Design a protein with these regions (language model features):
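A non-catalytic, amphipathic alpha-helix used as a structural packing/dimerization or gating element
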Residues: 58-66, 214, 250-253, 303
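Active-site glycine-rich loop that binds ribose-phosphate moieties when present
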Residues: 152-156, 213-214, 302-306
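C-terminal active-site-proximal or functional interface alpha/beta core segments in diverse enzymes
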Residues: 10-12, 236-317
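A charged N-terminal "starter" segment
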Residues: 1-170, 190-191, 217, 221-222, ...
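Domain-wide signal for the mature, well-folded portions of proteins, strongly enriched
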Residues: 40, 48, 113, 206-209, ...
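Active-site-proximal beta-alpha loop/turn segments in soluble metabolic enzymes
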Residues: 141-143, 178-204, 229-244, 270-296
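Active-site beta-loop-alpha junctions enriched in small/polar residues
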Residues: 84-90, 109-110, 130-132, 150-154, ...
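Metal-dependent enolase-superfamily TIM-barrel catalytic cores that perform enediolate-based chemistry
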Residues: 168, 201-219, 245-253
Length: 317
């Protein structure tokens, strides 16, 4: 499983000219049919049958580039984008992500396997998930992935496995943030309606402030474990920008608390995903979140970068 990430030239993207454009690479052609890039979807269905999943490589690349640029243009620091492999764990898309310089968020053995098979740099991969099995931990440690942990027991298991394998391992700590300021913000999720705080408290696992301090202190005493980051995932429960800014601010506040109580300042904060995507008015299924009026990437990036910079300066981090 060799590392081929970033070894190829940048792929040039050329927008298409449609009669009616849904994006630069999807639209209605002059013949009245739906087109994806240079392909008439009706002709594709005739050849491959229906239902048919079609992905625009150019749209995929463009979206990644726009998202990353929004943050690199607004944040005065290092930015790394991790693709959520669970969204589509195909070998082809993972290879495209490698070409674009994207890392990866992995759940389980299969997602790690595909990422490594595609030649992804293991240092850009993170293993997430609750109740990780020893098989997953061994695979992550053997290949040099960072592991986001959420319990003292998991820290102990990682220590034992890394010692057995004679490997060092980077870890992150998944936080259970106190999002009190979102108690009056309504959100939606697969578990039903409720405020964003209620949804977060009931569905997001992780460590409390006190538990985080305890686990950091324990990790500092283990020679083969290196602390890398803290992590939180708000999830796709709203398309408003401010809740994500609240989450980012709280993560920096926790960084200060951790530093004051352990001497360790997290060099990286992983702010998770859940970003709402926009779509053409009247297309696609209706959902509880208003995708048709979603903020743009730049809206998220400007506000979140502003908040992180303000809080970091406030606490001299």
């Amino acid at each position: 499983m060799g590392n081929s990430q970033n070894s190829e030239k940048i792929v040039e993207l050329v927008p298409k000219d449609y009669k009616l454009s849904y994006s630069d690479f999807v639209g209605i052609g002059n013949n009245g049919n739906l087109w994806v890039e240079d392909c008439d979807v009706e002709e594709l269905v005739k050849e491959y049958g229906s239902p048919l999943l079609i992905i625009s490589e150019s749209q995929f690349r463009q979206s990644f580039r726009q998202f990353k640029k929004a943050f690199t243009d607004n944040y005065n620091g290092e930015v790394e984008i991790l693709y959520a492999n669970k969204s589509n764990n195909s070998l082809a898309l993972r290879h495209i992500m490698n070409q674009e310089g994207g890392g990866g968020d992995c759940f389980g053995v299969n997602e790690m396997y595909i990422s490594l098979l595609a030649g992804t740099n293991p240092k850009t991969l993170v293993l997430n998930g609750s109740n990780k099995q020893d098989e997953e931990l061994e695979m992550a440690i053997s290949n040099g992935l960072c592991i986001n942990i959420d319990s003292m027991d998991e820290l102990s298991r990682i220590s034992n496995i890394s010692t057995k394998l004679n490997k060092t391992v980077e870890i992150g700590i998944r936080l259970a943030l106190d999002l009190d300021s979102l108690a009056d913000k309504t959100g939606v999720s697969m578990h039903g309606p409720g405020t964003l705080k209620e949804q977060s408290d009931s569905t997001k696992w992780g460590m409390s402030r006190e538990q985080t301090v305890e686990i950091v202190k324990a990790a500092q005493q283990i020679e083969n474990i290196h602390l890398k980051e803290t992590h939180f995932h708000l999830s796709r429960m709203t398309n408003e920008v401010e809740p994500f800014a609240v989450m980012a601010r709280e993560m920096v506040t926790w960084s200060h608390y951790i530093k004051e109580n352990t001497g360790w300042t997290p060099p990286c904060i992983d702010i998770g995903g859940g970003w709402t995507y926009g779509r053409w008015y009247g297309t696609g299924p209706n959902s509880q979140i208003d995708d048709q009026n979603a903020p743009k990437y730049i809206d998220y990036a400007k506000r979140i970068s502003e908040v992180i910079s303000e809080e970091a300066a406030k606490y001299d981090l």
